[in-house]
Each structure stands twice: as structure tokens, then as C-alpha cells.
Amino acid sequence: MKTVFILISMLFPVAVMAQKSVKISDDISITQLSDKVYTYVSLAEIEGWGMVPSNGMIVINNHQAALLDTPINDAQTEMLVNWVTDSLHAKVTTFIPNHWHGDCIGGLGYLQRKGVQSYANQMTIDLAKEKGLPVPEHGFTDSLTVSLDGMPLQCYYLGGGHATDNIVVWLPTENILFGGCMLKDNQATSIGNISDADVTAWPKTLDKVKAKFPSARYVVPGHGDYGGTELIEHTKQIVNQYIESTSKP
């Protein structure tokens, strides 16, 4: 009987977490991480990779909302924004992309038409201009704290990785880190798309991330399941294995 009770107690938090997940369409699902933070997964076709699930985040404070990354297109982004409005009773006012790729800024055009303010690494802004993509309005170089009606969203550029311009966003009131595509999930075994990566800098960037956010409760990667700080070291192992395999004569 005692064994059964312990097993039920261990499973109960998982059941509670599962109850906080919702599928709002065939290609978008949302999971609540805390009272104010949600992570979403959008499924879309990415050239050369097939159907890919991509993560982003929704942060809520006093009926205002911030999106960290968008789905890959305007249609999915509109669906997500409408869900935030209708289900969370919040207006999306703020957008912060992880880097310049489509699975981060694909819906920026729609957000701009809605008057949403966007904040990005200046490198992301420059790359978006160069490639003829929608361009975020407000840039920073090393770090920027964006206030969501008093709730700090701390943006940091700590170096190149999956992309030369990738950042992380820290939510200090929630102890949640959005690492984006710089980080791999625990099930990942491949380095993935490195067409725009700075592979040499990547391990050093990860060391900075690990040192800066040792207390993160949740760490959310760009693709795959969220976890804890172990994702940082796991990603470093994958990158180092790739570097070693490609440096052999």
C-alpha cells in the first residue's frame, strides 16, 4: 500500500502538468509552465527538414502579453494571438525573437500590422534588413531589459551558436530561461541545421549561459521538450562531438 501511495505521489505532478496542455489547432499546442508563462509548439514544413515542431513562449502580466518567437507564418501567428486574446484575456504588446530564422520571426509582419513592439539583437535587425525580411523595431547589442507592465524580460547576447545572432531571454520572476535554437532538448543527438551557425563559438557561449543562469527552473530549447539546466551541458556535448568529428583528418 505504501509503495502504491508513493508511486501515485510521484505521478501526480506529471498529471497536473498534463492538464495544463491544450491543443488550439492541428499544428499548435500550448503548455503552461507557471502562472504567467506558457510554451507553445507550432508544427510547420521547413525546407530541407520536413515537418518540424518549433517552440516559442507566451508571457502574461496584467492583461499584457509578450511572444518570444513566432510560428513560421502569419496564419499560425494570428491563430496564436487570437488564442491569447480570447483564452488568456491579454493583448500581445511585445515581441522578442531569438534570431533571424523563419521559425523565430516568420510572423513578425502580422505582429507589426497589429502594432506590436518588437525588440531584437541589433545583429538580428541587420540580418533581417539584408535578407529582405520584416525588421524588428528596437535593437540592442549586449543586453536589454524589456518591461511587460513591470515584469522584466531580460535579453542577453552571449555569443554565437546555432546562429551568429542568437540570444537568450531570462524571466527572473519565474526562473525560466528561453534558450531558443542555441539549445538542444534532452533527446537530441544531432547538431541540426548549422548553415548559419558559429560552431567554434558555440561551446564558449554555452559556458556563459550555464554560468549566468544556474538557478533556472525550466529551460526551453528551440525544438523538442523543455527541461532544466542539463540541456545546456547536453547541447555542449553534441556540439563538441561535432567539432571533434569534423576536425579528424
UniProtKB/Swiss-Prot annotation:
Zn(2+) 1 binds at residues 99, 101, 162. Competitively inhibited by 4-morpholineethanesulfonic acid (MES), SB236050 and biphenyl tetrazoles (BPTs). Also inhibited by chelating agents such as EDTA and 1,10-phenanthroline. CcrA is not susceptible to inactivation by the beta-lactamase-blocking agents clavulanic acid or tazobactam. Its EC number is 3.5.2.6. Residues 1-18 form the signal peptide. InterPro entries: Beta-lactamase_class-B_CS, Metallo-B-lactamas, NDM-1-like, RibonucZ/Hydroxyglut_hydro. GO terms for biological process: antibiotic catabolic process; response to antibiotic. Zn(2+) 2 binds at residues 103, 181, 223. It catalyses: a beta-lactam + H2O = a substituted beta-amino acid. Monomer. Belongs to the metallo-beta-lactamase superfamily. Class-B beta-lactamase family. This is Metallo-beta-lactamase type 2. It comes from Bacteroides fragilis. The gene is ccrA.
